[in-house]
Amino acid sequence: MKLKALSVAVTVALTSFTALAADEQETVVVIGSALDQLVQTEINSDTLEKKQASDIKDVLNTMPSVTVDGNARYSRKVYVRGMEDKFAVVTIDGARQEGQLFHHSGDQAIDPAMLKRAEIELGGNSALSGSGAINGSFSYETKDPSDLLKPGESIGARVKTSYQTAYERFATNVAVYAKVNDKLQFMGIANYSEDGDLHIPDQEAVTSKQGELKSGVAKVVFIPNDANEFKLTFNRYNDGGKRQLSGEKAGALYADDEHNYHSLNRDTVTLQHEYDAGSDLVHLKTNIYYNRQYMERDVLVDTAWDKDANGKWIKDGTIAIPDREYNVTTIGGDIRNISWVGEHELTYGLDGYKAEQWIDAGDGVYQSGSKQGETKKYGMDGGTVTAYGLYLQDMYEFSDFRLTTGLRYDVHKLGGVYDGDFDQLSPKFKGEYQTTDNLKLRVGYGRLFKGASLPETLTMKAAADVKQSDTKAMTGNNYEAGFDYELTRLLAADYAILGFTAYTYNLDNQMHPTKNNTTLANQYDVEVWGVETVLSYALDSLSVYANHSYSDGDQKDLDNGKTSHMSKTGIHNFKAGFNYSLNSEFVFGWDSRFVPGNDYTDEDGEQVKRAGFATHNIWAAYTPTFAKDLEMNIGVDNILDKKYAEHTGFGISWGSDKYTSYEAGRNFKASIAYNF
């Protein structure tokens, strides 16, 4: 079938910039969109290895319309098209990452050392992205044993060590992998990384954000026959230390404090099955998962607070607080089938999950003050979400058109300390028109729906303290239009493409999880608009990318009806880079960003100014032919030692230099790895 053959060709094209078979004259014929190409060439294990990626900022830093702020690993927050990733669907090996543990920490907890690749969908126009995809979706996939085994190998191991100066980050990585026979493969990867002082230009070293990352993945792949494949994966992420709790705040605020231990953790178990016997009607993919995100905090003696007769907070002695564990678990699954009916590729299925939050802790005891000897409960149960969706997507090609239509029916139910039932039927559409051999026009639409998410876990309230408002679902519309223009012949390149997208979306009854525990209130009606331009180019041993993105937005306060500028928007972002293979042994590259200064008027009428900045990173990788099992990488991030802060960051986004968390300065990094 014409469409099926085209789909296979596009998949091959997106796997690499240029595909060369044993016959050097064979090249890729069909090319995906400019954005797809950028994602697949910049977010894969090989590229991330060469650039020595060590946290989520390194993974996403080349993407248009995506900003990652925060200068410590546990403080990284991700913003997409003007809003936080709380309005995107994030999965790791298909497991949804639900809930917010703490509003001063990030929640995309994945170690690049485990990462194979990612799929990124900007906007909410796909029926396959899952329930609640407003501004996009991030689908991360961990490595397989076959990714590490070399041709002809049945067993292997790899040891790597690295160091980064700006974070005083020392890391060691060990991997073991094996192919028992044609049916069974397994692997294990363990990574240990220790951060010391954080170095920022023109400031004292930050001593309050030190920590240790312990992460790992274990995977078994079972292929009983040509039609079936099973993958069982366990992934753990543990990032902790005696450090300031509020990771996104400036370190100088806590330089002289004594810090207690806390950690941000994730345990994920997934079982994936794929059945494909070559039938046009049955290509079944099933995924079930358990995901637990949790924060651990040690015992401490702290100030006890109470309200006086006027409702003002006052100090009232001290209280001994026990160990606490803040939990969000998500159990769910997705079963989908792909059928070819004539020229139609139909994808349909059912997905669902249940998310639950609670605090596991003993009682605190007042040590002094008016309540001396009394106890305070810290353990409690919170809210639950039960959600499921039915979806259908049809991709159909005729003449010079490709139409992708979809429907999702989502049901979202609140439980535990909250109540609410929400549902919506959401149509989705993507249209492509190949006007010439080079030019493809694109349009898209998605009806948006997101039920009320669980609020922040750290600030949970007991059931007696919850006074829920008339909580509504978040709904809206997403519109997009753009083009992809192939420039391969015009530029005499192996491959070149330019893409442009303009978008606008609105979200009514927007609500953010931060401190929204008592009322679970809807807060704003928002409207965001923006543009994205992406260029990818390859010739011989040279690959180049460049992109620009901009978003702007307004929000209407549902309490007072006042409209104001959205503080995470109004930002131009230019990104560019290249990599060049000097020979079979040596490859080097450069990545650059430029963010112009900007200003806006906040909801109080105050002018907020954000200073512009430019940063440059360089890197190189060396694999000597005399020792092919040896790999060496060097690099320098922020080579000009620029003092800057991401415009979406805490403090700078609302005009406070005191709270602004500036990014790391010049960062020399090096690694060496050996394969056994």
Identify the function of each model-found stretch.
Residues 22-23, 129-130, 145-155, 182-183, ...:
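Short loop/turn motifs that connect adjacent beta-strands in outer-membrane beta-barrel proteins
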Residues 22-152, 168, 247, 268, ...:
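Acidic, small-polar-rich N-terminal luminal/periplasmic segments of exported/outer-membrane proteins
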Residues 131, 464, 528-529, 571-574, ...:
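C-terminal beta-signal and terminal closure region of outer-membrane beta-barrel proteins
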Residues 145-146, 154, 167-171, 175-264, ...:
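Periplasmic-side early beta-strands and strand-to-turn transitions of outer-membrane beta-barrels
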Residues 161, 281-301, 441-442, 472-531, ...:
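Membrane-embedded beta-barrel scaffold of Gram-negative outer-membrane proteins
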Residues 223-237, 264-418, 434, 489-491, ...:
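Face-selective signature of the C-terminal outer-membrane beta-barrel domain
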Residues 238-242, 246-252, 369, 413, ...:
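Surface-exposed extracellular loop regions of Gram-negative outer-membrane beta-barrel proteins
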Residues 396-403, 492-506, 521-603, 640, ...:
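Gram-negative outer-membrane beta-barrel transporters
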